[in-house]
Amino acid sequence: MSIGRNTAIAGVTLAAGALLLTACSPDESDNASPGADGKKVELRVATFPPGADKAAYDAFAVQEKQFEDLNPDIDVIGVEYEWTGPTFAVQLAGGSLPDVFTVPFTDSKTLLENGQLMDVTEEMKALGYTDKFNPVILDGVTGSDGKIYGFPRQAYAMGLHYNRDLFEAAGLDPNKPPTTWDEIRKDAKIIAEKTGKAGYAQMAINNTGGWQLTAETVARGGRTQEQNADGTFKSTINNPATVAALQFLHDVRWTDNAFGSKYDLDWGTINQEFAAGNIGMYTSGSDVYTALVRDFGMNPDQYGMTVVPNEGENAGTLGGGDIAVVSPTVDSTTKAAAVKWIDWYYMQKLMNEDAAVADAKALSDAGQAVGTPVLPVLSKDLYEQSLTWIEPYINVPRDQMTPFTDNIWDQTPVGEPKGQTQAIYGLLDPVVQSVLTDKNADINALLTKADTDAQALLDK
């Protein structure tokens, strides 16, 4: 699930959107290229979530000018944007959706099924890098018709984020973060006792509770669903790994009193609490550092990241990401401009040295994060080469992230569940909340019901 991870965790209720497309579909007879009629094409592009600092927009202004200098027939208009699945259909119908925006991998399948993404197959082929993508990642933007509906732009793996100051205040070594779930629990208890802060916290609402419970199930070797040979799915929520993940939460909360007092956190609020120094550790995507500093004001010196402990047979690390897409309502002139922007703004910096350096310089000059750990959507070799290109501009404290960057390649990446992803995440939210708010919650009973409800969704 990611970008600002707000984009990667919101629930999806898009059924109405499919009905709206007929009324707002573009006129495909208009095959003009950008500016072909002598007029500038106005292109509305997504920028940042509400709350982004001025420096982020300063950097964007530099990049906007660079693009417009290269494409004088296109007028880029930045639009404040935050992905929220439940409002997507309304934005689509009301015309408030940017022409270019990003959506998480987990939601792209739903949008594809509803016909709510623009086909960019030929455009990607013309750009010449369709075959450069990791095939597993490209599959996430490929419809059942074999066509491509977006540009994978970044991916992440789950990480354990920790506050170095709280570690030091508790007498723990921030350069030696926990490597097992038992050690996480032990350190969380020490942090809570020594500092009065939450030693460990976890998301629990707006589908993020299910997202993180799934991640911690995978880390213990379990899976919440299986795909059958005929393409159908079987729910496997009630498994030993999920039971263990919930028992861990119960013990941190009720036995150790190390969870703090907030049991209704989501991606935004847990980041806010962590950035404010109120949480010792939590799990989230490895790319969250940028948002923590840019949107939530975290002091970089306080930040640390390590891998999520993998324990048991078939253990892995949940990953996700997001894609850049074109609104299905635009005409072909705007579509052509949109693809130019996506190629320039999102893609070229992943594979072209000059573009990577220009992007890194613009961000660095504006005080924005450069070098936040991500997973490559292309090849690992190309990703590592790109880090050498931008090395002079890297300003994130990567030495404080080496427990993650040194070990993530040894873990097995696992994609998010494909069947009814967000809906089932939503089903699991109350399970997490129950364990955190009811000392006597019956974990097996909760998971049995969730399994039944999830299977009903998968059978639709």
Descriptions of predicted regions:
Residues 79-88, 179-186, 261-275:
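Short helix-initiation/N-cap motifs at beta->coil->alpha
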Residues 144-153, 158, 168, 182-234, ...:
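Extracytoplasmic/periplasmic solute-binding protein
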Residues 2-110, 125-129, 174, 333, ...:
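Conserved N-terminal structural module of periplasmic/extracytoplasmic solute-binding proteins
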Residues 292-298, 313-318, 326-426:
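C-terminal lobe and pocket-closing loops
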Residues 59-62, 244-248, 332-345, 446:
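Short amphipathic alpha-helical coupling segments at ligand-binding clamshell hinges
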Residues 105-158, 212-219, 302-306:
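Hinge/lid segment of periplasmic solute-binding proteins
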Residues 187-188, 231-263, 308:
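Glycine-centered hinge/linker elements that transmit conformational signals in sensory
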Residues 121-133, 177-179, 200-202, 222-244, ...:
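Short, solvent-exposed loop/beta-turn-alpha elements that line the ligand-binding surface or hinge
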